[in-house]
Amino acid sequence: MSKAKMPIEVKKYYKRELYQYRKNKDILDDIIAKKEKANTRNILFLHRRIENIETVISKLNSFEKEVFDMIFNQNCDWLYCKTVRNIDKSTYYNIINKCIYLLAEEEGEI
């Protein structure tokens, strides 16, 4: 993982994308299940974002995947992660930053 500096706006954008992953996946599943008439461009864009995040998840090791699930799917803060799994604050934020960096790399931002 490179130490490339990324603008704060870009970092916030990709962090928001990671938090919206589960919601976006549910929206796409609903559209497909109901066979709604939706804009094809929007469906493709949503599908591409979901695939990129799934690629990021596949690059993580098992511990990081577990922490990823706690952070982005269960919306657990650092203190909860420390209490439940004894995850250090630096580890918590390192995993967040690693996911953001990998997602930016997948999107071609870096």
For each feature predicted by the language model, list its residue ranges:
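DNA major-groove recognition helices of helix-turn-helix
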Residues: 92-106
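N-terminal interaction/assembly modules
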Residues: 1-59, 107-110
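Helix-turn-helix DNA-binding module
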Residues: 74-91
